[in-house]
Amino acid sequence: MPRRIKIFDTTLRDGEQSPGASMSLEQKIKMASALERLGVDRIEAGFPVSSPVQFEAVQRVSATVKKAEVVGLARCVQRDIDAAYDALRDAAHPMLHIFIATSPLHREYKLKKSKEEILDTVRECLNYGGKGFSRMEFSPEDASRTEPDYLVEVVKTAIECGATSINIPDTVGYAVPKEFGQLISFLVEQVPQFSDGSVDLSVHCHNDLGLALANSLAAVRSGASQVEVTLNGIGERAGNCPMEELIMSLDVRKDMFDVETGIHTEYLYPTGKLLQSITGLLIPRNKPIFGDNVFVHESGIHQHGVLNKRETYEIMKPERIGRSSETIIMGRHSGKHALEDKLSQYNIKLTRQQFEDVFARFTAIADKKKEVYDEDLFSIVGTVLGGVVKGFSLLYFHTFTGNSLIPGATVKVRSEAGEKVASATGDGPVDAVFNAIDECVGINARLKEYIIHAIGSGKDAQGEVKLEVEIEGATYGGKASSTDIIEASAMAYLNAVNRFELRKR
């Protein structure tokens, strides 16, 4: 039977320490609920003593979360422990997390304490914490740079004083996988409570050298029973071990790890996107698991392979993490197989000569653009066929807005049925344009996601809009770019509507 690995999420505490990642109380509650749905075992809600806002956040999360353990951080200081106890009073499953640094650098320059003084502090604080908590985690900060024999002494002392979980932090991301794995193996050998499972052995790895995931996986193979993570890898400096990367590494490579977690992987991507929307920290396009490029293929050779058998170039299914399965990006490296597949999605049927003409025109455009959008293909096919491909196209738009005006828009759209003009108001000019388009096309679409980013720099930079809309219970994506972000938004919205219309037919 696979060994069970606990997932300790610290997105709300360590993750929020990432510059620009601060969250409001309501946002923290929303994230905590999403993390609980995801299936994490422990949620570190904050550092209660650090501020009234942190205290209230831990308090509110404690009252919201019912299944996962809610954790409050504290230094080895009695007032910190008291604050954590008060903040966690309403938690169904409260846990105290106490830490103190143990490495020579921290002992000499930060704490100015001897080894024995630190051991005395550990005894005093854990004994005090045990009066209010049945579950306590202890972290010897900077453990990876602490003398191994002294680290064992500190760990054994903490367990004797009531710690039910010991966390080994690579606080500054200094360790490398072989070294960190050996440290975990050494602790398992020296501390019987780790091998018999009566005390959790946790790891908390930072990513300063880009090794947080590798070190965490090395620790799991060496006997760690819990891994501390953040969604999207956010956190101090270079961040923490990304939950999504750890979970899918363990999932995809079961042959190497033979472990299981309680994570419902189909909620990974939606939860990561929720965090992005709350913090505004964009997920890089090439980020493992969550990046936009992970499940898309532009190379003709790769596209041909994926169209025949997805496993040729994909080691996991996007649906496994809650992503859509659209995988082909049309660009300069795309081949005929990919173009045929894209046209078939819209039920566009061509003779062999017409297809060759379309492919030649497509190649010419692809050499000039990073990505060829569906609207470009519609235009090419329309030119070759001598008519308009089924769908809607934007003829013009006009918007007005201001701090004392209700934003509005007028839009003119062309389709097979003719041209139509509509006006609408909205919560800003983009929303007004979308509402006007709905009037023109006669469809009620609900915007689910809207992302914009710059292509290039300076005054000639283009804004690329990527969005998703829900129509009749199904989700359709759209993309477009323009130097005018409202125009790009309108074109992307029509792109999504055209996907619905053309696939419906």
Curated annotation (Swiss-Prot):
Q: What is its EC number?
A: 2.3.3.13
Q: What are the entry keywords?
A: Amino-acid biosynthesis, Branched-chain amino acid biosynthesis, Cytoplasm, Leucine biosynthesis, Manganese, Metal-binding, Transferase
Q: Which SMART domains did the record assign?
A: LeuA_dimer (SM00917)
**Record-level Gene Ontology MF annotations:** 2-isopropylmalate synthase activity; acetyl-CoA C-acetyltransferase activity; manganese ion binding
Which EC class is the enzyme in? Answer: transferase
Q: Which reaction does it catalyse?
A: 3-methyl-2-oxobutanoate + acetyl-CoA + H2O = (2S)-2-isopropylmalate + CoA + H(+)
According to its record, what are the GO cellular component terms?
Answer: cytoplasm
Q: Which residues form the Pyruvate carboxyltransferase domain?
A: 5-269
Q: What is this protein called?
A: 2-isopropylmalate synthase
Gene giving rise to this polypeptide: leuA
